[in-house]
Design a protein with these regions (language model features):
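Chalcogenol-based redox active-site neighborhoods
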Residues: 1-162
Length: 162
């Protein structure tokens, strides 16, 4: 897949899951470095936001926005995955007061490769948002082709309301 960062074109390795696909089983890690298998089988929809680094302006804005929106969608689980270390994520969450979503790190393992979001030239994952139904099927996906841009919140939040 093609993405850009400040206009410079780069390629991901592989293809991300598309609408209609069952999301692949992947592992990310929580603040205690415990493996979390995604998608979770909680019987809820899942909004999965993948961001390059939580310590950048756009990733921070996006994650805080989803943390705020989680209050309006109690029937939806919100998870953000980034390439950051657990220490960076803990520090960011403490500073920003983010408590309504789960922040997972994918700085080890094969999350980026399995999801098709690895951008080797960038050294991080591409920015993408997925909404999965209760069975783990992708019902919405948005690859943010300009990595330094935010996703289309109105469009994806409308999808959550369905």
């Amino acid at each position: 897949m093609k993405v850009t960062r400040h206009g410079n074109e780069m390629d991901t390795v592989g293809e991300a899951p598309k609408v209609g696909d069952i999301f692949p089983t992947v592992i990310a890690y929580d603040e205690d470095d415990q493996a979390v298998t995604l998608p979770k089988n909680t019987g809820k929809k899942l909004l999965l936001s993948v961001v390059p680094s939580i310590n950048t302006r756009v990733c921070s804005i996006e994650t805080k926005r989803f943390n705020m929106e989680a209050d309006n969608f109690k029937e939806v689980e919100f998870i953000t995955v980034s390439d950051d270390s657990k220490e960076d994520q803990k520090n960011w969450c403490a500073a920003e007061g983010v408590t309504n979503l789960q922040l997972l790190h994918a700085d080890k393992g094969d999350f980026a490769e399995v999801t098709g979001l690895d951008v080797p030239e960038f050294g991080h994952m591409a920015r993408m948002v997925f909404i999965l139904d209760e069975t783990g099927r992708v019902i919405y996906e948005e690859l943010v082709t300009e990595i330094s841009s935010e996703p289309d919140y109105a469009k994806l939040l409308n999808e959550l309301k369905k």
